[in-house]
């Protein structure tokens, strides 16, 4: 089940998300910018976002640990996030993935299109992807 992360989830989320500081993670959870997929109180995946140009939802992290991949966890997190962003009135969302990562294929499968790239010093080329979301 997908839900917004709670304060009590932070220690488990931190195991998966090492890209931000604990203070940043706590703020993201407080600001309701972190989702968790839980089954039997076990976190099987996370999604965390911020805002590009302070106005476009940008999915910074979609992570499903080995053992939980290919079971619909990532799809559930992505769809829940997109629906939440649409409900909040956004008409497009962004994400990014490194060019050598498989994630780009996952996002394209769900309607994301390349809109640009950045050279991430030493890490390689980062692809920026966009998806238009519609109000129903």
Model region roles, listed by residue range:
Residues 70-83, 108-109:
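Conserved acetyl-CoA-binding loop-helix of GNAT-fold acetyltransferases
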Residues 129-136:
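Short beta-strand-to-coil "C-cap" segments at the C-terminal boundary of structured domains/repeats
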Residues 94-96, 113-128:
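Conserved catalytic-core motifs of GNAT/GCN5-like acyltransferases
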Residues 85-98:
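Conserved GNAT acetyl-CoA-binding A-motif
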Residues 4-60, 65, 116, 120, ...:
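Acetyl-CoA-dependent GNAT
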Residues 62-70, 98:
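A short, internal acetyl-CoA/4′-phosphopantetheine-binding micro-motif in the GNAT/acyltransferase core
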Residues 78, 101-103, 120-126:
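Short glycine/proline-centered loop/turn elements that form peptide/ligand docking sites
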